[in-house]
Every structure is written in structure tokens, then in C-alpha cells.
Amino acid sequence: PNAWDIGVCNNLLNMLAREKGVEYDAEGSIAKSGKIIDDLLDKMLSISYHKLPPPKSIGVEWIHKELYPLLDKVADHPIEDRMRTAVEYIAISIVNDSPKTGKILVTGGGAFNHFLIQRLNELADEVEFYLPESDVINGKEAFAFAFLGLLRWLGKPNVLKSTTGASK
């Protein structure tokens, strides 16, 4: 497989940030100020999705079903601690499901979370998490869909079962 959903990032972090009264955790500063809730982290990491072989895919409904109930059980903990635990969960999930050496291009809104990127680099000894220019980060999905459209226009396959897990 060439691509799959490792886990969640901004959907989870933004949901928690809204509890703090902000739309997102700018640069990861709220999460950085918290402490890890070990029991919560263990439960998040033991979710069966992480044991599935790629390709695999996650949607928002998965977050509601699998993660929100775990977070609800620790609602009495400060939001900073829940966010810190979420960042650690995301970073560990990414590192566990990524190549162990080389460079990995980081795109999407999570690339602007400096604390998440810091944790990725601290957890992965032989991997460099590379951040492209902000235009590339912001435009990733538009670029991808434009490329898929071009392939379709040229009459070439634009969906590969090795990437999506489709049967044909």
C-alpha cells in the first residue's frame, strides 16, 4: 500500500480546543502545557484499528465512536491534559505506522502544530519529518484532486486498489 489513514489529527485536536473556547490549538501551546493521562493514552493506543494492516481508512464517525467515549470518561481532567494526551496518541500512532528511516513529508493542518512536530521528531530516531512551504501544506488536497482529475481526463486510472483497499 502507498497510502492509508494512520489515525486522526485535527478533528480530534480541534474538538478538544473548542472546549477551551478556541477553534484550534495554535502551534500546540495548549497541549504542550498539559500532562499525559497514562490510562487514557494506553486505551487510545490499544484501539483495534491500529492493529489492522493497511490500507485502512478512518472517518469522522470513527472518531465519534472510538475516541470520544474514552475522552468523555476523563472529562474531569483539565483540557490541557486531555489535549497533551491526544497529541502523544497522534504522534505515537504516526511513528508506529511509518517507515523507520528516511524523510516523511508532513502536510495538512497538523503540520502547523509545532508541538506535534516536535513530538514526532523526538519519538522517531531515524526519521526526519519534513515540513514543506505553507502553500504546499494548505494546498495538498487541491493539488491531489487536480492530479486525479488530470489522470481521469487522460483516461488513466486515478484510483488504485493498493492505496484505497478497494477490491477492483
Q: Model-found features: residue ranges?
A:
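Conserved ATP-utilizing enzyme core subdomain
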Residues: 2-87, 91, 154, 158, ...
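Catalytic-loop motifs flanking and including active-site residues across diverse enzymes
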Residues: 8-13, 86, 116, 138-141, ...
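A structural micro-motif
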Residues: 22, 102, 125-128
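Acidic-glycine-rich active-site phosphate/pyrophosphate-binding loop
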Residues: 62-70, 115-126
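Glycine-rich phosphate-binding/hydrolytic loop that grips phosphoryl groups
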Residues: 88, 132-168
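Glycine-rich phosphate-binding loops at beta-strand->alpha-helix junctions
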Residues: 102-120
